[in-house]
């Protein structure tokens, strides 16, 4: 058990297993990008990156320049693609730290080229095409082809790749995704007819890695499946064996017997119906255990489920342990993960919150220590 009152346990052996599975289902010849943005979906970017690279990933993906710089400062030398927006003021950091940058407007290409010229280097770029997601990217079409061809001639830019992102690959109906992919391929064909070649063409996200091998091209981008979670309930889970890497745990801080009619937590929204036992756990919404789990969430203590009672506080939450004999201060409580024969999954927590498993792991805040199992 950890020395901390609350901690997130990250099983790097699970990450290593998942990257092996991702490699197994990825088409031969396609590289694997491990997407480690948002502190590796809450799991710890440095440790996950090192584990993924050791397991066969060739690239890393981040959302922001600062995330890429942090990886470089940790001694990670693998190629890193900044998938999102970078300000003109940060362009020099892209060059200095040998990052690759997503480009999706003329202005972005120009300020990156200017920064590269000042540094006496070339900027590595991946052009982003919007084939139906509605986020960043040139809208696929003749106008985009003309502009990309023009910008690719800038001597300060080294064109490494071109990519798009699927909006609904995790749906059972793949028609929209295949339409997006067709637009992407048609645009690449037009660019190639005009003499522009791309070392790396990439489109496949986690769901497409699992179910659409024809979209794997030169590289795939593994996000949520790297962490052992499935993209949705509509994908075929039999295609890949995943192991969840994160558990959220705490130690029981206090246990007290309370009478019937006793009110618990802010707003007095919960009243005991009979005499019972309430345990306090030292985590709350400041740790990423959402207030929306008030009187909805559960914890595992002694391998049994204890319901959250009353409102989740900033730093504490109360659970009813009346039906669990012998609970005492210092006992382990599991908010996400397995204890004994019971499991509370990130998907279960997400369902109670009306959200997705991605958000559940990302919500675990920075003040929660990560404890790594190697």
Curated annotation (Swiss-Prot):
InterPro entries: Ala_racemase, Ala_racemase/Decarboxylase_C, Ala_racemase_C, Ala_racemase_N, Ala_racemase_pyridoxalP-BS, PLP-binding_barrel. Substrate binds at residues 135, 314. Pfam families: Ala_racemase_C (PF00842), Ala_racemase_N (PF01168). One of its GO terms (biological process) is D-alanine biosynthetic process. The modification N6-(pyridoxal phosphate)lysine is found at residue 37. It catalyses: L-alanine = D-alanine. PROSITE patterns: ALANINE_RACEMASE. The active site is at 37 (proton acceptor), 266 (proton acceptor). Its EC number is 5.1.1.1. Keywords: Isomerase, Pyridoxal phosphate. SMART domains: Ala_racemase_C. One of its GO terms (molecular function) is pyridoxal phosphate binding. Pathway: Amino-acid biosynthesis; D-alanine biosynthesis; D-alanine from L-alanine: step 1/1. Its cofactor is pyridoxal 5'-phosphate. GO terms for cellular component: cytosol. Catalyzes the interconversion of L-alanine and D-alanine. May also act on other amino acids. Belongs to the alanine racemase family. This is Alanine racemase. It comes from Pelotomaculum thermopropionicum (strain DSM 13744 / JCM 10971 / SI). The lineage of its organism: Bacteria, Bacillati, Bacillota, Clostridia, Eubacteriales. The gene is alr.
């Amino acid at each position: 058990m950890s020395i901390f009152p609350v901690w997130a346990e990250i099983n790097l052996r699970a990450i290593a297993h998942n990257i092996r599975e991702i490699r197994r289902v990825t088409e031969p010849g396609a590289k694997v990008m491990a997407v480690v943005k948002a502190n590796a979906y809450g799991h710890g970017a440095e440790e996950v990156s090192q584990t993924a690279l050791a397991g066969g990933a060739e690239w890393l993906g981040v959302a922001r320049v600062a995330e890429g710089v942090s990886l470089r400062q940790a001694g990670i030398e693998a190629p890193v693609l900044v998938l999102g927006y970078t300000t003109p003021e940060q362009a020099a950091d892209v060059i200095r730290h040998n990052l690759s940058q997503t480009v999706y407007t003329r202005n972005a290409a120009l300020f990156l080229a200017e920064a590269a010229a000042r540094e006496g280097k070339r900027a590595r770029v991946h052009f982003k095409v919007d084939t139906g997601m509605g986020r960043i990217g040139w809208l696929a079409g003749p106008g985009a082809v003309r502009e990309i061809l023009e910008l690719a001639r800038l001597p300060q830019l080294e064109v490494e790749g071109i990519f798009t992102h699927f909006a609904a690959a995790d749906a059972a109906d793949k028609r929209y995704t295949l339409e997006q992919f067709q637009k992407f391929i048609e645009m690449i064909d037009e660019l190639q007819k005009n003499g522009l070649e791309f070392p790396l063409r990439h489109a496949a996200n986690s769901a497409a890695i699992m179910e659409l091998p024809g979209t794997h091209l030169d590289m795939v981008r593994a996000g949520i499946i790297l962490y052992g979670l499935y993209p949705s309930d509509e994908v075929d889970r039999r295609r890949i064996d995943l192991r969840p890497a994160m558990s959220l745990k705490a130690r029981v801080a206090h246990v007290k017997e309370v009478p019937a009619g006793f009110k618990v937590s802010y707003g007095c929204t919960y009243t005991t119906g009979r005499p019972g036992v309430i345990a306090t756990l030292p985590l709350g919404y400041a740790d990423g255990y959402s207030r929306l789990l008030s009187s909805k969430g559960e914890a595992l203590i002694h391998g049994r489920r204890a319901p959250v009672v009353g409102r989740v506080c900033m730093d504490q939450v109360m659970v009813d342990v009346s039906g669990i004999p012998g609970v005492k201060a210092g006992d382990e409580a599991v908010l996400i993960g397995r204890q004994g024969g019971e499991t509370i999954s990130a998907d279960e927590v997400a369902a109670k919150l009306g959200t997705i498993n991605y958000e559940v792991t990302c919500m675990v805040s920075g003040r929660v220590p990560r404890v790594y199992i190697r």
